[in-house]
């Protein structure tokens, strides 16, 4: 009888700390909105009506980086300023202009944080990607990494881009049925309509993506596997031109390029932004000033939150996590 009484406190402590340990496990949903400019996210009275959920969560329960009017700067470190290079930098934490200089379907020689997480026993078979753009599987090098990337559909806005609504539904299905600990979601209609000069459809796509993010968050809040344990990080792969205007001469940066364009000669194309909220994010609201944040810091930030070892092929990190936003 006495040994049993002595064991009771120990059993109680094991139950309490075992529960707390489980609760401490972090899950992440990383969302990219292709080619959405910081101006649409941060400028003017329209911002609260255009992206109400990002503002509700980022301002009150998280952080927002990239409002250049407040001297908060985020940008890509690569010199290409296009989607493949932006996503590779975002997810791999390195720049590789030597090998990545266009949007062709080539297998990425760099390893993404998703691939590194998948290689860890804690995340084995618990990492997924869902994308609207059919180049994402190559950026994640799904042939080498064997990551499950959901991107196929007959419902498409173009040959390479499927409807974002399909991507949302597939992402929700993945959350509910597969319970990944790390999920990457990529929406692409903003960039598609931007390139085609359809301003209202570009804005509609941005607003729609905001509502999609709300649905993904609410899905997580209704599931004990995610509730209280999940961090959302939303960002973009590149910026766009700043205004209407003529093209620059060959080799010059065009400071008056149309918002429909992006690339290494289009001023503003390197400018990005980030909104984060959830379990591991400090409540800093809309941030001001400070050092420039680079898109290559996103991957090590994800790795830091999930406690995934993160180094490049030389066993040295190229970029550090965005420590100031982390709890």
Residue ranges and their predicted role:
Residues 235-277:
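Histidine-centered active-site microenvironments of extracellular/periplasmic hydrolases
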Residues 44-53, 68-70, 89-111:
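His/Cys-centered metal/cofactor-coordination and adjacent catalytic loops
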Residues 1-24:
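Bacterial Sec-dependent N-terminal signal peptides
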Residues 25-37, 117, 181-188, 205-206, ...:
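Beta-strand elements within well-structured catalytic alpha/beta cores of enzymes
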Residues 97-160:
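Catalytic-site neighborhoods of secreted/periplasmic enzymes
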Residues 139-151, 169-215:
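Active-site His/acidic residue clusters
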Residues 42-82:
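Short, structured active-site-proximal loop/turn typified by the sulfatase FGly-forming signature C/S-X-P-X-R
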Residues 121, 278-282, 289-323:
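Non-catalytic, well-ordered alpha-helical segments in soluble enzyme domains
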């Amino acid at each position: 009888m006495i040994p049993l009484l002595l064991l009771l406190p120990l059993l109680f402590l094991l139950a309490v700390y075992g529960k707390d340990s489980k609760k401490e496990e972090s899950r992440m949903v990383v969302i990219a909105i292709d080619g959405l400019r910081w101006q649409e996210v941060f400028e003017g009275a329209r911002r609260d009506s255009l992206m109400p959920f990002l503002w509700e969560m980022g301002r009150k329960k998280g952080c927002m980086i990239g409002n250049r009017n407040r001297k908060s700067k985020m940008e890509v470190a690569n010199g290409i300023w296009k989607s493949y290079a932006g996503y590779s930098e975002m997810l791999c934490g390195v720049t590789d202009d030597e090998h990545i200089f266009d949007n062709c379907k080539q297998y990425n020689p760099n390893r993404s944080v998703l691939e590194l997480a998948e290689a860890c026993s804690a995340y084995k078979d618990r990492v997924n990607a869902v994308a609207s753009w059919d180049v994402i599987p190559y950026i994640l090098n799904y042939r080498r990494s064997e990551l499950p990337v959901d991107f196929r559909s007959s419902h498409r806005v173009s040959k390479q881009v499927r409807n974002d609504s399909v991507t949302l539904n597939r992402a929700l299905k993945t959350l509910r049925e597969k319970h990944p600990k790390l999920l990457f979601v990529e929406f692409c209609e903003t960039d598609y309509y931007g390139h085609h000069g359809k301003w209202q459809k570009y804005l509609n796509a941005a607003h729609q993506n905001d509502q999609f993010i709300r649905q993904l968050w609410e899905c997580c809040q209704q599931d004990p596997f995610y509730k209280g344990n999940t961090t959302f990080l939303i960002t973009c792969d590149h910026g766009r031109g700043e205004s209407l205007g003529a093209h620059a001469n060959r080799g010059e940066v065009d400071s008056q390029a149309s918002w429909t364009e992006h690339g290494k000669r289009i001023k503003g194309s390197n400018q990005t932004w980030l909104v984060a909220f959830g379990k591991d994010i400090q409540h800093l609201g809309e941030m001001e000033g400070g050092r420039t944040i680079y898109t290559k810091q996103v991957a090590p930030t994800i790795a830091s939150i999930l406690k995934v070892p993160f180094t490049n092929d030389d066993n040295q990190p190229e970029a550090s996590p965005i420590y100031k936003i982390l709890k």
